[in-house]
């Protein structure tokens, strides 16, 4: 028997797996319909599946809404610190910041600057959920406030693209004060008679929704986006009631007057251009031609 086992061992050939040259992200599975989509085709559609599911974009990917070559970044040097010396059971906040910055290539959540859409100049601030859940900390608030003040100074509209899980707990009350700081900057924008257009994308929760994103002149949401302050489970546990199936979706918010329109990503560029043309024709910005033809809001 021993000899038989030894002979059988010699008869087997060890086959090592062949390493594939195909990168892991060539094919992307839709979280909704589970279809596999070639990454180049997905990029051409701005990460919208054929089933209509809107996947998350990075802040840099959102900048494709702007005219090519028009974006000039501001405040890229701003980086968050660790004012509380926060340490959780899993890791220190300072370590988490360094790792997230390395992984995303961002200094913090917000990328901001000045660009144009079909020739209409605007100040823009875009959130990236990949950076600690899009949480609102000191640099987030500072960049957003500066973007609003820049728009007021230059006499151009402000466009914010918002996705967030709420205030950054690692920065404590410093994070919470950003809500008031950004809203104060927006009052100066309003005094300069410049519009704030907010785009809410999935997910948009906490302090961002509770502050500046909900007081914009025009609020646009993407289809299916989850928007709210507290999460669904927290609310249900608090009020001890079952919420509607579509609660906190963009469509629910539109039905109840919390957003002005729900716009698919493929149509967003055109809608923004029409809105900018509308404000320009009203003479609210010296940066625009007074001869522009204004569309009606109903036609957008």
Curated annotation (Swiss-Prot):
EC number(s) reported in the record: 2.1.3.15
Zinc finger (C4-type): 30-51
Catalytic activity: N(6)-carboxybiotinyl-L-lysyl-[protein] + acetyl-CoA = N(6)-biotinyl-L-lysyl-[protein] + malonyl-CoA
Cofactor: binding details: Binds 1 zinc ion per subunit.
Keywords for this protein: ATP-binding, Cytoplasm, Fatty acid biosynthesis, Fatty acid metabolism, Lipid biosynthesis, Lipid metabolism, Metal-binding, Nucleotide-binding, Transferase, Zinc, Zinc-finger
InterPro entries: AcCoA_carboxyl_beta, Acetyl_CoA_COase_Trfase_b_su, ClpP/crotonase-like_dom_sf, COA_CT_N, Znf-ACC
Superkingdom of the source species: Bacteria
Cytoplasm is among the record's keywords: yes
Record pathway: Lipid metabolism; malonyl-CoA biosynthesis; malonyl-CoA from acetyl-CoA: step 1/1
Membrane-spanning residues: none
Compartments where found: Cytoplasm
Cofactor: Zn(2+)
GO biological process terms held by the UniProt record: fatty acid biosynthetic process; malonyl-CoA biosynthetic process
GO molecular function, one term: carboxyl- or carbamoyltransferase activity
Binding-site list for Zn(2+): 30, 33, 49, 51
Chief place of localization: cytoplasm
NCBIfam families: accD
Quaternary state and interactors: Acetyl-CoA carboxylase is a heterohexamer composed of biotin carboxyl carrier protein (AccB), biotin carboxylase (AccC) and two subunits each of ACCase subunit alpha (AccA) and ACCase subunit beta (AccD).
Name of the protein: Acetyl-coenzyme A carboxylase carboxyl transferase subunit beta 2
Originating organism: Roseiflexus castenholzii (strain DSM 13941 / HLO8)
Biological classification of the source: Bacteria, Bacillati, Chloroflexota, Chloroflexia, Chloroflexales
Gene behind this protein: accD2
């Amino acid at each position: 028997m021993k000899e038989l086992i030894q002979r059988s061992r010699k008869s087997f050939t060890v086959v090592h797996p062949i390493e594939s040259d195909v990168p892991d992200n060539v094919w992307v599975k839709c979280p909704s319909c589970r279809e596999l989509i070639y990454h180049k085709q997905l990029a051409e559609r701005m990460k919208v599946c054929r089933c209509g599911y809107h996947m998350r974009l990075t802040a840099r990917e959102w900048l494709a809404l702007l005219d090519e070559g028009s974006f000039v970044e501001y405040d890229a040097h701003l980086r968050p610190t660790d004012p509380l010396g926060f340490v959780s059971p899993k890791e220190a906040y300072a370590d988490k910041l360094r790792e997230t910055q390395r992984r995303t290539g961002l200094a913090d959540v917000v990328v901001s600057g000045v660009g144009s859409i079909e020739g209409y100049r605007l100040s823009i601030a875009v959130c990236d959920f990949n950076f600690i859940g899009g949480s609102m900390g000191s640099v987030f608030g500072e960049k957003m406030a500066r973007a609003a003040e820049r728009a007021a100074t230059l006499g151009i509209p402000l466009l914010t693209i918002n996705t967030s899980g709420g205030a950054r707990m690692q920065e404590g009350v410093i994070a919470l004060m950003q809500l008031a700081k950004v809203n104060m900057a927006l009052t100066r924008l309003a005094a300069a008679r410049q519009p704030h257009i907010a785009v809410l994308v999935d997910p948009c929760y906490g302090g961002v929704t509770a502050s500046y994103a909900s007081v914009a002149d025009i609020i646009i949401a993407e289809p299916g986006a989850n928007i709210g302050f507290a999460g669904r489970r927290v609310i249900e546990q608090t009020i001890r009631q079952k919420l509607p199936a579509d609660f906190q979706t963009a469509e629910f918010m539109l039905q109840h007057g919390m957003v002005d329109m729900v716009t698919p990503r493929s149509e967003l560029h055109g809608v923004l251009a029409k809105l900018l043309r509308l404000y320009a024709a009203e003479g609210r910005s010296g940066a625009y031609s007074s001869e522009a033809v204004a569309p009606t809001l109903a036609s957008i």
